[in-house]
């Protein structure tokens, strides 16, 4: 989180050199797309991390502010609903975030306003071609002047529903989601990711070294600390319990986004260890006809556990 160094990334489906000719001839090319950096996704509730950050940073809300979180509600001439239309009653924001209430977070987004929501998304990297030594498709947000109240409510929950000249948003890459989680773990400072640590000559001499590069302070350190606390609640007692790892505190945020043909994608962003984060993970599992509800958190937890073990072995060697 403190440097932006990318330790690993994986995209599936992939390909081998032997398959390349067949893939090109088929004209599909799906395997050639690096889904970590080039594919844009509706982030679902993982975007609520930005909504919560903006709400706290602008003093629009606090973690203890209570919200009515009905199963469905009318907003701006349209309907906002929780998953399975669950009525959560009147609850504090920290619980609404942990349980991922759309109706509560939509109210926060409307109170925040479109200008603020889009501005904070951009502060976290939206609209930027992230990467010091690789290319990333910029994540998208609408022109705030074109957003309706209903669209703003859903955008605050990570679902792009707008139809206007500017792109519907939010739309994000897996890498952008990692940058958001890393910024929260890093006291609100956004780091530009990179893959190559250093370049060596054939003789082993250091030719160049990549220096960490900040993209700015998205939110204050105090705001980041409060959002970290809320993200801990997601994994400890909310929708992200599947990411729990024995003996390690993990903080994160889940997300689910409907896609075409009744499918949906499962997201998880998180970091560990909670008190002194050294690792960040960003996961999207595409449904493609399978029920992947909650699977993003399970995969994220397993990835963090394995990487923490590797770090521990490296420190001990």
Protein language model annotation of sequence segments:
Residues 1-45, 50-285, 292:
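Beta-lactam-recognizing serine transpeptidase/beta-lactamase-like catalytic domain environment
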Residues 205-211, 297-317:
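Short, gly/Ser/Thr-rich active-site loops of penicillin-recognizing serine hydrolases
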């Amino acid at each position: 989180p403190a440097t932006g160094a990318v330790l690993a990334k994986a995209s599936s489906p992939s390909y081998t050199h032997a398959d390349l000719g067949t893939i090109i001839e088929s004209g599909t090319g799906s395997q050639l797309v690096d889904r970590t950096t080039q594919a844009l996704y509706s982030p679902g509730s993982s975007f609520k991390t930005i909504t919560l950050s903006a709400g706290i940073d602008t003093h629009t809300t606090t973690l203890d502010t209570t919200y009515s979180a009905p199963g469905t509600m009318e907003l701006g001439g349209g309907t906002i609903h929780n998953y399975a239309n669950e009525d959560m009653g009147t609850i504090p924001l920290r619980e609404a975030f942990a349980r991922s209430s759309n109706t509560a977070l939509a109210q926060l987004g409307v109170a925040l306003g479109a200008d603020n929501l889009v501005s904070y998304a951009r502060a976290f990297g939206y609209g930027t071609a992230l990467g010091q030594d690789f290319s990333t498709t910029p994540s998208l947000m609408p022109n705030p002047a074109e957003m309706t109240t209903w669209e703003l409510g859903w955008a605050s929950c990570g679902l792009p529903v707008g139809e206007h000249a500017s792109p519907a948003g939010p739309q994000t890459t897996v890498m952008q989601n990692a940058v958001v989680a890393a910024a929260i773990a890093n006291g609100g400072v956004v780091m530009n990711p990179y893959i190559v640590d250093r370049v060596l000559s054939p003789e082993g001499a250091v030719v160049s070294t990549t220096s960490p590069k900040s993209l700015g302070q998205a939110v204050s350190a105090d705001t980041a600390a409060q959002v970290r606390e809320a993200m801990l609640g997601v994994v400890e007692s909310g929708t992200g319990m599947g990411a729990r790892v024995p003996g390690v505190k993990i903080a994160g945020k889940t997300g689910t986004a409907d896609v075409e043909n009744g499918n949906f994608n499962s997201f998880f962003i998180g970091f560990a260890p909670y008190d002194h984060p050294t690792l960040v993970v960003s996961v999207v599992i595409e449904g493609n006809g399978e029920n992947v509800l909650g699977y993003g958190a399970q995969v994220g937890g397993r990835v963090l556990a394995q990487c923490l073990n590797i770090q521990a072995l490296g420190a001990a060697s």
